């Protein structure tokens, strides 16, 4: 079996918003990599066995006392080093060069002139012309003098050192961000460093990852049984498919139907996993319990806690019926691992993420199986397709853990949930028919607990309002509202009002994030 972790890259994170993007780009090349905080125990660098080290960008200034620095072990390792933005600045400052604060921050598109061909830049061109490249800048400081042994490889009209290298040491730096798509040749630069300079083989593929994880799971659990909380979301669905392939009927999935899922989602989950794939799934119809617990509750955080705690309670009840289960499978993904690792000094960037499931009871005493813990979300999706899950399931828009409970403003009632689920299904159906679903990052309907005057036939109606929300985003930290065609919105509105009894008005949310959040609650 191929060892997919043999060739790997270590990324030291100095707090950049793009650090995870660097890792994702390297994984896309086909090479495994890990992100460590810049102040991670440096004695572990040699033992990690990386083929090369990348120093990320960051918000600090190398011109100020106490700025984060790369451990000396990085330079003593003999490994290739690639500094990006702040990473290049600290590379210069630590190796005898100089940095200075710019008169004005540089953010956005820029063009760099390649003035010396090294292993990264040789023969590289794009639409900007020969020896001139389109890049993306985001910096306040810049390198004013390169260290001894370094050559300036690129400049701009505003800064003297846009890139530098010491070919003998295999140390490289760029002031711009190759991981961002606006840098047109960025992926080529990263590939040249990872594959050509570091000599990594491209072994990190979906097929190899599946083979590796199947072997790991079988070795970990042996003949024991495993339970999994199956939500119908991407992560738990991929875990279910992967574990079923690895251990067959030793996997039992518990699917809690809360009554707050997408339209007919419970039936779809059962059809896909229980009927089509042959996975052992216990379906718990818990809608009555959820609506009873949520009666009279209007505060969003209170609703979230009730929904989460009740899931844990029901999952605990079902797991107690499975006496032979020794392992709990979870859909933990790599951003969760990065967040929990944190930083010793608190200066390194801590990446926040939303967890699908809250803490499970300590008395369960089950071992953890986390086959996705090395993967980013886009990698999880690719695994899902490789495992045979439908693309429509794997590439669905995000859905909040509390489900429709936070898309019904105020008190949650069964009739509200049924109305909203149907309205949402109409919106999504029309997006797919118009080939707009994949151009939006997230789209959904919201139930507003207010009534509006309308006219149905010749009679006055006083009925509910449905809001539609669609956004475009790269990272979900910021988002633009999707500029859907007016004719399309009219079609959706007409269908909702005509097909759903009790709705007299449909509105479209044109708020960006910030100031609004993507979800309404």
UniProtKB/Swiss-Prot annotation:
Active site positions: 85 (nucleophile), 177, 179
Pathway membership, UniProt: Purine metabolism; GMP biosynthesis; GMP from XMP (L-Gln route): step 1/1
A Gene Ontology term for the protein's cellular component: cytosol
Alphabetized PROSITE patterns for the sequence: GATASE_TYPE_1 (PS51273), GMPS_ATP_PPASE (PS51553)
Catalytic activity: XMP + L-glutamine + ATP + H2O = GMP + L-glutamate + AMP + diphosphate + 2 H(+)
UniProt keyword list: ATP-binding, Glutamine amidotransferase, GMP biosynthesis, Ligase, Nucleotide-binding, Purine biosynthesis
Domain Glutamine amidotransferase type-1: 8-203
Keyword check for ATP-binding: yes
The keyword Ligase is annotated on this UniProt entry: yes
Residues reported to bind ATP: 231-237
Molecular-function GO terms, alphabetical: ATP binding; GMP synthase activity
Quaternary state and interactors: Homodimer.
Function: Catalyzes the synthesis of GMP from XMP.
Protein name: GMP synthase [glutamine-hydrolyzing]
Native species: Xanthomonas axonopodis pv. citri (strain 306)
